From Swiss-Prot:
The protein, known as: Translation initiation factor IF-2
InterPro entries reported in the protein's UniProt record: EF-G-like_DII, IF2_II, IF2_N, P-loop_NTPase, Small_GTP-bd, T_Tr_GTP-bd_dom, TF_IF2_bacterial-like, TIF_IF2
Region annotation (G1) ranges: 128-135
Chain spans, region G2: 153-157
Domain of life of the native organism: Bacteria
Length: 620
């Protein structure tokens, strides 16, 4: 006689709790084990000597011979312990003790036995330029694959939906409002996409957001399908699109590449079935599988607070099956799931891998990109959630980016820094090419320099979002004759992204090389005091052009340096000649007020220009 499903689930919950408690109790054996030194954390010289059965004086003498006077209580770094292990002739390995702070990662990294894995639907994100038909393509796919009576009933709040093709295959589409949402989740370590469909209009070709989409797709390291849209429009030229995309490394199969290109029309539903078939084919080649018979885990797509229903989260199940009454731990949040519904607001009893659903019952609103795990023991779930909160608070006190340009010499010498990732924004394509060429010639021993974006234009929020996805090493956004605005600067500060600004190529290159050699000059920090928009122009025969402005951020001060920015590009950098407020000489004009100024040796001011006041300070 079969056990009731309820009892089976209860037994599974008990087994899961026992397993978690066992992992938390298990201690990692450290010290010399079979010729390998095993450790979990940095040790003092005395602790290290004891574990390798050596007199502490031997280690102190080793450092004395190197000119270092240490004592037995000096804490050794992981690199120093590694060097000592090699000195004494044995290998070394770091093990991680399982704690309530990291148990979620342990559970998420659980590898299932192959025999428990079953085929799952692919998860697809459509990306591309804003006017190239992404929304139309999503709508056409939705309406072609759902029952007519429900075609208009898909809620946009879920952030994803699942279709069933004519061949009875399921595909999940992530419906993101822009590249930022996709990037934000990746910056939090959540890789949710299996395949990216890049949509490009046949009559328009590659546009700035197309380039951004390519950058994001390549960083996600997933297969790309190109859908050339609007082939029904006059002036469409699919071959031009294929040629343009070649310089980004996207070469069509017909030209000897490995990227599938599909020519179609979203609005007229031309070749949508071919697109779906290609997605299914690639998913089969990728061998996408998951175990549906374990406790669920996955990622939050979107979340908000509903005044009537409380915290509401759209989630994507990646492993296991999510059911009502499951207790979900999501980052620092947890709760018993009271209700699950799909994109049609239909009640869902069980959500299997690749299924997007909306859940109710968490005690707080989670963040997009947070990973969740079902732990069906309320006491344990609460304790783990509290531990996650403590861990998050500690991490927030630390700097997000461990490396800065000023200190990379030390990190390179200690073997901590292996990658320097650059985003380059410049005033002209010629500047972009010159910078890429010069940077490619830099040789820093043991360090790889990666340029993940190099394009024309002002430093934007998209650049900062892309930089935030880099998980390894140092990332720098370089601006050459271009500037970030106040919103971008604030976002960069919040995300701990370093922005460096230059107007001479060799100085930019020199700065990077000198930093690697540890001979970087004392840092001169630029402090932006304020920005103002030019709203009126006045001509004066004696003093030249007067720019009437409105201060949008900070203040414009009389003794500050001033630069003129036009469409994100610096057109002049100099000094203020005169500053007035209400036709009176002024020392400063603050945000929310109007003023007027003249600039020494510069009269080519235009309406819409941005005045940026700044000063230079040496960092102590």
């Amino acid at each position: 006689m079969k056990k009731p499903v309820k009892n089976i689930k209860k037994q599974k919950a008990q087994n899961q709790t026992k397993n978690i408690k066992k992992q938390l109790k298990e201690e990692v054996n450290t010290g010399l084990i079979d010729g390998i030194f095993v450790y979990t954390e940095p040790l003092s010289i005395l602790e290290f000597a004891t574990k390798i059965n050596k007199p502490v004086t031997v280690i102190l003498k080793h450092y004395f011979n190197q000119g270092l006077l240490l004592n037995q209580n000096t804490l050794l770094t992981e690199e120093q312990m590694g060097e000592l292990c090699l000195e004494f002739g044995f290998d070394f390995k770091k093990e991680t003790s399982v704690t309530k702070e990291n148990i979620l990662e342990t559970l998420l990294d659980t590898v299932d036995d192959e025999k428990h894995l079953k085929e799952r639907p692919p998860i697809v994100t459509i990306m591309g330029h804003v006017d190239h038909g992404k929304t139309t393509l999503l709508d056409s796919i939705k309406n072609s694959n759902v029952v007519a009576s429900e075609a208009g009933g898909i809620t946009q709040a879920i952030g994803a939906y699942q279709i069933t093709t004519k061949n009875n295959k399921k595909i999940t589409f992530i419906d993101t409002p822009g590249h930022e949402a996709f990037t934000e989740m990746r910056s939090r370590g959540a890789n949710v996409t299996d395949i990216v469909v890049l949509i490009v209009a046949a009559d328009d070709g590659v546009m700035p957001q197309t380039e951004e989409a390519i950058d994001h797709a390549k960083l996600a390291n997933v297969p790309i399908i190109v859908f050339i849209n609007k082939i029904d429009k006059p002036g469409s030229d699919p071959n031009r699109v294929k040629t343009e995309l070649m310089k980004y490394g996207l070469v069509a199969e017909e030209f000897g590449g490995d990227i599938p290109f599909i020519e179609g029309s979203a609005i007229k539903k031309i070749n949508l079935d071919k697109l779906e078939d290609t997605i299914i084919l690639i998913s089969e080649l990728e061998n996408l599988k998951a175990n549906p018979d374990r406790f669920a885990s996955g990622v939050v797509l979107e979340a908000h607070l509903d005044k009537a229903k409380g915290p509401v989260a759209s989630v994507l199940v990646q492993q296991g099956s999510l059911e009502i009454k499951d207790i979900m731990v999501v980052g620092t949040t947890f709760g018993s799931i009271k209700h699950i519904e799909d994109e049609f607001k239909h009640k869902v009893l069980k959500a299997e891998p690749s299924k997007p659903v909306v859940v109710y019952g968490l005690n707080q609103v989670p963040k997009a990109g947070d990973k969740f795990v079902v732990i069906n023991d309320e006491k344990m779930a609460r304790e783990i959630s509290e531990a996650q909160l403590k861990k998050q608070q500690e991490e927030e006190r630390r700097t997000k980016q461990a490396f800065t340009l000023d200190a990379i010499k030390q990190h390179i010498d200690e073997g901590e820094l292996k990658n320097i990732t650059l985003i380059i924004k410049a005033d002209t394509q010629g500047s972009v090419e010159a910078l890429k060429n010069s940077l490619s010639k830099i040789n820093i021993s043991g360090v790889k320099i990666n340029i993940i974006r190099a394009s024309v234009g002002a430093i934007s929020l998209s650049d900062i979002s892309l930089a935030s996805t880099v998980r390894d090493g140092l990332v720098i956004v370089y601006g050459f004759n271009v500037r970030p605005d106040a919103i971008v600067r604030k976002k960069a500060e919040e995300d701990r992204i370093e922005i460096r600004l230059h107007n001479i190529i060799y100085k930019l290159i020199e700065e990077l090389e000198d930093a690697a050699k540890g001979i970087l000059d004392p840092e001169i920090k630029e402090v932006v005091l304020g920005q103002a928009q030019v709203r009126a122009l006045f001509r004066h025969s004696a003093i030249g052009t007067i720019g009437g402005f409105y201060v949008v951020d900070g203040a414009i001060t009389r003794n500050a340096k001033i630069r003129v920015i036009r469409n994100g590009v610096v057109v002049y950098d100099g000094e203020i000649n005169s500053l007035q407020h209400q036709k009176q000489d002024a020392k400063e004009v603050k945000a929310g007020f109007e003023g007027a100024l003249t600039i020494k040796n510069f009269n080519d001011i235009k309406e819409g220009d941005i005045f940026e006041a700044y000063k230079l300070e040496q960092v102590k």
